[in-house]
Regions:
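C-terminal and inter-domain tail/linker signature
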Residues: 1-200
Length: 200
């Protein structure tokens, strides 16, 4: 809570010998950000799934967890319907405090009512030109968690584009710019179950 309005943030701490060694924070101030996408007020909901310990048979080693999260970014970049990762049937994504999957109330996208895999199979995110400077500073094998950071670049050149189902839609981002992100993935049995992203 800031003096004039609430803000959403993601925070990464690196602890060494019981001392803070690194701090990384992304703060979304919806009243101050450029309005390429109009974000609703964030809705913060506790997600116990991020704390649950996975049964051993559903865990994956560190390198595989990173590969699954990296495959998500490969799928997102110039999204044309091709999947480079796997999604759990109950997968949900929250972006800047807004649930953007399985949520027909989302006003800024035509695919909000669909699940993670269905959205990507449509090629909805073609306007995401590049996912660069990817880092994976935190991996928790027991909980199936990967925290990623990086930049989403938008060239801003797309006006309209065609989804894989034949629909023609307007690109939501119309000028060149980049978002910086912190994105947390919960991965169960090799499939992405929950995504929580904060980007500015």
């Amino acid at each position: 809570e800031e003096p004039q309005f609430p803000s959403l943030f993601a925070l990464r701490l690196r602890i060494e010998r019981q001392r803070i060694a690194e701090v990384e924070m992304v703060i979304l101030r919806t009243v101050a950000e450029p309005k390429s996408i109009i974000w609703p007020e964030p809705v913060l909901v506790d997600k116990p799934v991020f704390r649950e310990i996975l049964p051993p048979e559903q865990r994956r080693p560190r390198e595989r967890l990173i590969s699954i999260a990296d495959g998500y970014f490969d799928t997102l970049q110039l999204n044309d319907g091709t999947l480079f990762t796997e999604f759990h049937e109950d997968c949900n994504r929250v972006e800047n405090g807004t649930k953007t999957t399985n949520n027909p109330a989302v006003a800024f996208t035509s695919v909000g009512a669909l699940g993670c895999e269905e959205q990507f199979r449509l090629g909805n995110y073609r306007y995401d030109t590049a996912l660069r400077a990817r880092r994976f500073p935190l991996v928790d094998e027991e909980r199936g968690l990967v925290l990623a950071s990086g930049f989403i670049d938008h060239s801003g050149v797309l006006d309209k584009y065609t989804l894989t189902d034949g629909r023609v839609i307007d690109a939501p981002i119309r000028y060149p710019h980049s978002f910086y992100l912190l994105e947390l993935f919960r991965i169960e049995d090799g499939k992405i179950r929950q995504i929580e992203a904060v980007f500015v």
